[in-house]
UniProtKB/Swiss-Prot annotation:
Membrane topology value: Multi-pass membrane protein
Gene: dsbB
GO molecular function, one term: protein-disulfide reductase activity
Protein name (Swiss-Prot/TrEMBL): Disulfide bond formation protein B
Organism: Haemophilus ducreyi (strain 35000HP / ATCC 700724)
Similarity-based family: Belongs to the DsbB family.
UniProt GO BP: protein folding
Length: 179
């Protein structure tokens, strides 16, 4: 099984799938914001940044998945983004499951001064005035944080499988004179 995932990681379609899934979730969030009128909270914006990291990881590996540097850079970014997105989604769920005055998120995203994404791309990364504990949307009884926990858990699971597969040695190519 690991050799199968190693072979997948050496080809572009698998990385295109990662980028497409992340882009689909990103576009879905933007659709909820701009078309359905749901105002994103700060945690939603942070989760959106994690999805952007997954998208960038897929695009980096699309350049040349056979080259060690591109593949490992994409793997590191994939793992970090999936882990960070999962931890942010769990924290966001905690805000909604246990609302209290002392368990709240910030009012404005705290991006580094060198990369103020909320100022550079306000239509994508600017948060509204919504409290993180407010549930604005549900599907099948689950809110946005629960669905993102599922999504980031799957991203993390497949990252771990692909990461472990990188240490699998390739099968030697036996060449026959008569073949």
């Amino acid at each position: 099984m690991l050799s199968y995932f190693k072979e997948l990681s050496l080809r572009r379609p698998a990385w295109l799938l990662l980028a497409t899934l992340a882009c689909t979730l990103e576009v879905t969030g933007l659709y909820f914001q701009h078309k359905l009128g749901l105002i994103p909270c700060v945690m939603c914006i942070y989760e959106r940044v994690a999805l952007t990291g997954l998208l960038i990881a897929g695009l980096i590996a699309l350049i040349a998945p056979n080259f060690f540097l591109f593949r490992w850079l994409a793997l590191v970014l994939w793992g970090f983004s999936a882990f960070k997105g999962l931890s942010l989604s769990i924290k966001h769920y905690d805000y909604q499951a246990n609302p209290s005055p002392w368990n709240q998120c910030e009012f404005k995203p705290q991006f580094p001064q060198t990369i103020p994404l909320d100022e550079w791309f306000p239509n994508i990364f600017a948060a509204g005035t919504v409290n993180c504990s407010e549930k604005q949307w549900q599907m099948l009884g689950w809110g946005m944080p629960e669905w993102l926990i599922v999504a980031f858990s799957l991203f993390m699971l497949f990252f771990l499988i692909v990461f472990m597969s990188q240490f699998k040695r390739a099968k030697p190519q036996y060449r026959s004179v008569f073949r």
